[in-house]
């Protein structure tokens, strides 16, 4: 059996292959995944919409409650506590008001899970090479000099320009 922990970090790992004890921090998403249907109403009604999206290499915007990337598993939103008006000022809660299943959980905290496992697959993603190491290409100086990853996001049908290359 495979258990998938998304939006989580491995805190510690003890034991040996085949007999491991894992301590996993499951970061708060601010939603109840069992109640959320992934309808997207909360993301469309959120008034905070000008946050540069990490997945689109900051070339497109997202709201304070958002699905981290297309085809996310599970395809459900997370609340960005650093940009959410409720967490900053104690006001708003529009996402909570419009949610048809009452899945928003502003009081949700990180959870620590300890489990015994035989093996672990860690999918950490990647780190993009910093462009300031190559000043001769003019990245940051000329607006039309972009990284390969930025070009990939622009060319993608799910990207900030819906696949239309325009600069």
Task: Describe every region a protein language model picked out.
Residues 1, 5-35, 47-146:
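Non-heme iron-sulfur electron-transfer modules
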Residues 33-38, 157:
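Short, charged, solvent-exposed linker or helix-capping segments at domain edges/interfaces
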Residues 37-40, 163-167:
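Rossmann-like NAD(P)H-binding beta-loop-alpha module
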Residues 84, 157-164:
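Short, glycine/charged-enriched hinge/interface segments at domain edges or termini
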Residues 141-158:
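A nucleotide-sugar donor-handling region in carbohydrate enzymes
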